[in-house]
């Protein structure tokens, strides 16, 4: 067997596919990140070792703001290139919807670096608008107001506009137009109104229903005409500045985007023909991320196009429509939050322990006292061959089921059941190995790897840190961050530490295809074994919940300066005290209640005074500790 190399690991985990030049494997066999154009490599294992010296324990979320900056620059440069190629004569604006990641340090970094790149912010709710207006105080960047709106939302937006903010209020429902008109007249403001149009076109992938006739938001063609009539009657025709459409997030197929763009461009043309001088088109979101690195339109975790191709289609479609109809090119807005934010965050978790299925030692042989079914299964195991692999599988299944039934009725003993189970799983392992060499693998054997996988128990909550993995079976790139110059000899599923059977990951992107298990190494004594979960910067932090009261993980900001990495900030993960307060417990009251109980127990002689003090000390220190295992 040839020696394992880091090139083998690169291929196995397809890091060159999903890493998009940000992630790789160094000569030490560790995963590195390259956040900047200067190609400075940050060894993630080195980072974890330094954090351990600072008493920072996993799980930890590593944020690389330089990657955010690079994604902004990359998207802007794609627009610049397309504008030159298609002689685009208007402005383009990249807008970050903060619902993608509302964490203050992330939003502030995007705003700060995005100022020179026409980067704006989108708010989809009243709380988001409150955040956006405040952090954008010193900027004249565009603010897009989406989502459902009431009178106070609209008043806040209009007053901000009156003070100089470039705000567009997008009408999602007809009744919002009435409120906008009323508040604008009251405040003496000429509003910048946008209208979200419900296209017939829809996206592809997990969020396909976000667009098309079944979409939640937007005005139909008939409602659009009604809105235009309302604007005319209120003498607000010139307030209509923008049209907006959105066909879904993470669109996997470029053809769906092209179809939607063509449809939307005709709305722009028709409005101009009707005398409405709309000068902005918001193309919404949808620019996807290649999570599995396959560039496959058939994978819901991938996309079959690049940022440049997406941008080219956006600009070309509207330039072509405008030129054909002799109308101005529109200013184009894209809300590509997932593409901007996904790559900048890496979740690092440590493996606590492992569990494997029992296997029969190779030297085992049944004796004269063994049950006949043990002898029968041993005969199958001893004579396995590729020719009869499916028949052997069926026979082994039948024997196991028969023994389980006999055990349930008290007919066979525990020793017989244990021998059958261990031998059955040994048979399964060998059948799986044999089936890999078959030209046509029987359908029943295709998922046998799912049955055989080890369980690697990791110190994290799936529901808190990777909610999309649980909720919609989103695939994220996952791999060990060390020992990648060694051959991984085990295959495992990942189990979290919640008391929930759903707290597991059993779908992985490996070797350019999806697998039910992840290739991993056996654990070494007294050595931490870390797994990295990549591309988690979009939606995961903010969607995470406190199942089993596991709180936010520690977040660490790492930047590159003068060719070296620097740990800029450490945001401590939530403590037990903090999560208890979320669910309306008063930690001080809890301590007082325990003090009374302990005093009573000491008085009754159930524990000593020293034991009582030790108990209260442990309880108090636990309240102020990390919600995860330390």
PLM features per residue range, with description:
Residues 20, 25-102:
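Low-complexity, highly charged intrinsically disordered N-terminal segments
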Residues 7-9, 73-81, 104-109, 129-130, ...:
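Short alpha-helical segments and helix-capping/turn motifs at coil-helix boundaries
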Residues 251-259, 290-307, 339-354:
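Short glycine/threonine-rich loop-to-helix capping motif typified by GTGT followed
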């Amino acid at each position: 067997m040839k020696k394992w190399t880091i090139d083998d690991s690169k291929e196995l985990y397809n890091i060159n596919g999903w890493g998009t030049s940000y992630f790789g494997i160094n000569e030490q066999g560790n995963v590195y990140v390259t956040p900047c154009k200067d190609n400075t490599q940050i060894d993630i294992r080195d980072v974890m070792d330094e954090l351990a010296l600072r008493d920072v324990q996993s799980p930890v979320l590593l944020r690389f703001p330089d990657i955010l900056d690079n994604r902004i620059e990359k998207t802007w440069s794609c627009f610049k290139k397309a504008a030159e190629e298609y002689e685009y004569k208007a402005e383009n604006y990249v807008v970050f919807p903060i619902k993608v990641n509302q964490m203050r340090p992330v939003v502030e970094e995007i705003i700060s670096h995005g100022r020179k790149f026409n980067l704006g912010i989108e708010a989809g709710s009243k709380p988001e608008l409150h955040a956006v207006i405040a952090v954008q105080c010193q900027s004249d960047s565009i603010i897009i107001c989406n989502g459902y709106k009431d009178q106070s939302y609209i008043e806040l937006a209009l007053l901000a506009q009156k003070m100089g903010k470039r705000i567009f209020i997008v009408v999602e429902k007809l009744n919002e137009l009435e409120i906008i008109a009323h508040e604008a007249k009251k405040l003496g403001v000429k509003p910048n109104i946008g209208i979200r149009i419900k296209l017939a076109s829809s996206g592809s992938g997990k969020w396909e229903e976000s667009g098309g006739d079944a979409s939640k938001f937007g005005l139909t063609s008939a409602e659009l005409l009604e809105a235009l009539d309302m604007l005319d009657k209120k003498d607000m025709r010139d307030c209509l500045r923008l049209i907006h459409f959105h066909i879904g997030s993470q669109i996997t197929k470029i053809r769906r985007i092209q179809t939607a763009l063509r449809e939307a461009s005709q709305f722009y043309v028709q409005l101009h023909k009707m005398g409405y001088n709309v000068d902005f088109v918001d193309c919404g979101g949808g620019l996807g991320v290649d999570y599995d690195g396959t560039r496959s339109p058939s994978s819901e975790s991938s996309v079959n196009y690049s940022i440049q191709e997406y941008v080219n289609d956006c600009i070309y479609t509207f330039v072509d429509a405008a030129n054909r109809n002799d109308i101005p090119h529109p200013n184009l807005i894209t809300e590509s939050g997932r593409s901007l934010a996904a790559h900048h965050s890496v979740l690092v978790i440590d493996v606590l322990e492992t569990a494997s299925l029992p296997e029969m030692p190779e030297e085992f042989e049944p004796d004269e006292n063994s049950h006949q079914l043990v002898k029968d299964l041993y005969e199958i195991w001893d004579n396995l061959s590729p020719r009869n692999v499916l028949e052997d599988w069926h026979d082994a299944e039948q024997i196991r089921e028969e023994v389980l039934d006999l055990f349930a009725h008290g007919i066979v003993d525990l020793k017989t059941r244990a021998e059958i189970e261990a031998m059955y799983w040994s048979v399964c392992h060998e059948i799986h190995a044999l089936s890999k060499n078959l030209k046509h693998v029987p359908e029943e054997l295709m998922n046998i790897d799912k049955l055989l996988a080890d369980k690697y128990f990791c110190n994290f909550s799936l529901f808190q840190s990777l909610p999309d993995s649980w909720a919609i079976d989103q695939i994220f790139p996952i791999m060990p961050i060390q020992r990648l110059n060694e051959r991984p000899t085990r295959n495992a599923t990942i189990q979290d530490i919640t008391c929930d059977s759903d707290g597991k990951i059993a779908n992985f992107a490996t070797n350019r295809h999806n697998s039910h298990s992840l290739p991993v190494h056996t654990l070494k004594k007294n050595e931490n074994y870390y797994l990295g979960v990549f591309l988690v910067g979009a939606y995961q932090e903010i969607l995470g919940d406190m199942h089993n009261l596991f709180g936010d993980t520690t977040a660490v900001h790492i930047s590159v300066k003068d060719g070296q990495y620097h740990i800029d900030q450490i945001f401590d993960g939530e403590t037990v005290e903090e999560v208890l307060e979320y669910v309306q417990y008063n930690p001080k009251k809890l301590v007082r209640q325990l003090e009374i109980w302990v005093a009573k127990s000491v008085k009754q002689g159930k524990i000593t005074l020293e034991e009582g003090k030790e108990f209260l000390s442990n309880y108090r220190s636990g309240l102020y500790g990390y919600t995860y295992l330390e």
